[in-house]
A protein has these predicted regions:
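Membrane-interface loop-to-helix entry segments
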Residues: 23-24, 160-223, 262, 284-293
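Extracellular loop-to-transmembrane helix junctions
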Residues: 41-153, 157-159, 289-295
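Transmembrane helix-loop junctions and nearby membrane-interface residues
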Residues: 78, 121, 125-128, 132, ...
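Membrane-interface "cap" regions at the ends of multi-pass membrane proteins
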Residues: 1-60, 70-75, 219-228
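Inter-helical loop and helix-membrane interface segments of multi-pass membrane transporters/permeases
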Residues: 53, 122-166, 172, 209-250, ...
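Hydrophobic alpha-helical transmembrane segments of multi-pass membrane proteins
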Residues: 64-68, 108-116, 166-173, 250-258
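Extracellular/periplasmic helix-exit of transmembrane alpha-helices
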Residues: 208-217, 289-323
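Hydrophobic, membrane-embedded alpha-helices of multi-pass small-molecule transporters
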Residues: 23-43, 163-170, 223-308
């Protein structure tokens, strides 16, 4: 008996490859905010550094200017990211809009900057994070061992290298675990940092300048240092004052702050992992949400510190080690 074959027309359905977009809008917004201007380190390193490097700097006013300058940049990246969400960065954009050699140069610079930045922030972890945290904890607990460890992480090259290698190893482990795991670590660290920032802002909001001076004098004397007034006099802070109209101070301050503030578009490099990456409104909300978060918290932090500590003291405290 002959078997009659039947031809069937079927709708082709693509079988899943297991490639799932893992990043939500919240993940991407936090990613942009923390990679661009982590609040604590930006206040300590970029903003207060400008007080001494460029006398007359007005960090609060410059932060507003920096935010305005970033608006057209973010619009451009958001629209390009939504138009070509799977290309994973600006190589395709630059090569199509300008030419491929410029795209290669641009991305090679990005790679080298990333490598140098990884080394810098690994050292940053030892010198500006781990060391001061141990010294502060040891001072509050009257524990000389913690203070000694903290000083070693800031001054001893072997301790600095050990702390940096631990950070690099931890980052490598996190990235190897994959995108979802990376964002869990990122968001967990973000929540811890935000808790510390909120507590610090609340303390500053209810603190007084007189209370700060009294506590500073008591703590600094335990290390053999002088009073707050001595610091101001030694650092020449008595006549320091912000002047936004002073272009000799404002322009270099703008470049310094933009070094941190200009990266709120960075999520375009992971658009292949972002859910609904082709949605323009979503891309705009992610980038502008990060910009608003950074700008508002940095301005609040600077204003609170200047209110309690004073512009004169912050200027002198940053210049005093160089005297």
């Amino acid at each position: 008996m002959a078997t009659t074959g039947r031809s069937e027309s079927r709708l082709f359905v693509r079988n899943s490859t297991g490639l799932v977009r893992s990043a939500s809008a919240v993940d991407a917004t936090i990613f942009n905010a923390v990679i661009s201007a982590p609040i604590g380190s930006t206040l300590a390193w970029s903003i207060f550094f400008t007080l001494v490097a460029f006398p007359g700097a007005d960090p609060v006013g410059v932060l507003v200017i920096a935010a305005i300058i970033n608006i057209p940049v973010l619009i451009m990246f958001a629209l390009l990211g939504a138009s070509m969400p799977r290309v994973g960065g600006d190589y395709v954009w630059v090569s199509r809009i300008l030419n491929p050699p410029l795209a290669l140069i641009s991305n090679l610079c990005m790679i080298m900057g990333g490598l140098l930045g990884a080394a810098y922030f690994a050292k940053f972890f030892s010198v500006f994070a781990l060391g001061p945290a141990l010294v502060a904890g040891g001072s509050l607990a009257h524990n000389n061992t913690l203070i000694s460890w903290g000083n070693s992480f800031q001054t001893d090259k072997a301790w600095i290298l050990a702390g940096a290698l631990v950070m690099v190893a931890l980052q490598t482990y996190i990235l190897i675990r994959g995108t979802k795991s990376t964002f869990r670590w990122q968001n967990g660290a973000f929540l811890i940092a935000m808790f510390g920032i909120v507590v610090a802002f609340i303390v500053l909001a209810f603190a007084s300048k007189g209370g700060f001076v009294s506590n500073f004098n008591a703590l600094n004397s335990s290390f053999g240092g002088g009073t707050a007034q001595n610091v101001i006099a030694t650092g020449g802070g008595a006549h320091a004052a912000p002047d936004l109209g002073n272009m000799s101070a404002t322009l270099p301050t703008l470049f310094s702050i933009q070094g941190f503030m200009m990266w709120n578009f960075w999520s375009v490099y992971m658009s292949g992992e972002l859910k609904s990456a082709s949605n323009r409104r979503r891309q705009l909300w992610i980038m502008f949400g990060a910009l608003a978060f950074d700008t508002v918290l940095l301005i609040i932090g600077a204003l609170l510190i200047f209110h309690v500590v004073g512009y004169h003291f912050m200027y002198a405290a940053n210049v005093a080690p160089n005297k």
